[in-house]
Amino acid sequence: MTKKQLHLVIVTGMGGAGKTVAIQSFEDLGYFTIDNMPPALLPKFLQLVEIKEDNPKLALVVDMRSRSFFSEIQAVLDELENQDGLDFKILFLDAADKELVARYKETRRSHPLAADGRILDGIKLERELLAPLKNMSQNVVDTTELTPRELRKTLAEQFSDQEQAQSFRIEVMSFGFKYGIPIDADLVFDVRFLPNPYYLPELRNQTGVDEPVYDYVMNHPESEDFYQHLLALIEPILPSYQKEGKSVLTIAMGCTGGQHRSVAFAKRLVQDLSKNWSVNEGHRDKDRRKETVNRS
């Protein structure tokens, strides 16, 4: 059996240069992430990792928060070089001293290496101590002029495979306003102005995924008119969401109970968007009334 290869990115660099944003970005890219890994534990940790998937990926922040960082990191990296089945890279995040000082002041943090409390002195000492590690790094990113969003985009371009770099998933869901708006929704649309199948006895206990309800909802002229305007609004903005580095866009369609109208609209929207995008369909409250009746 061919041994699976472990892909590791060691995230390090200057304090305040963006390591927190970086590790969150790697998580979005499908990496298993750990923040503040003591260097001495790294080889043992990698040995204990159970590789369950092809080409597993890890991203670990290793920095000066560990007191033994400067004394241990070189020996650890030498050991990793000789470890079979491991492909590892070092990502070093840097920024200009002036920008780092501004970031420390903005967060009201003191620099851990500034014995006298002067942030700039701590930064200069840190830069001197990290110089050998920076020279070893395969990827050095200067975040001086980067916003968090721009840093995420930069890392996605450098560490995603081609399929991931182009990935963008749309979640289309239905819900009932009476149960609350989904907290993770990016776009919310209200279809409560449309005729409600609930008031037709033969349709009341069905849902928008059932053909009779779907046809009833979508065959009304006002439904078709609204849907065409909805599609014309959504389709042109999807590339912009993708360009900005958003990995998941959640579109929520709501009606009163989330059983009929919103379900039908979500179903149709999925059918159309799926022609050009990766789309998942979900109906949060579709069966809620049925479950309530069964419990009573």
UniProtKB/Swiss-Prot annotation:
Keyword tags: ATP-binding, GTP-binding, Nucleotide-binding
Gene Ontology terms, MF aspect: ATP binding; GTP binding; molecular adaptor activity
Binding residue positions for ATP: 13-20
Binding-site residues, GTP: 63-66
Disulphide bridges: none
Protein family membership: Belongs to the RapZ-like family.
HAMAP family per record: RapZ_like
Protein name, entry field: Nucleotide-binding protein spr1424
Organism: Streptococcus pneumoniae (strain ATCC BAA-255 / R6)
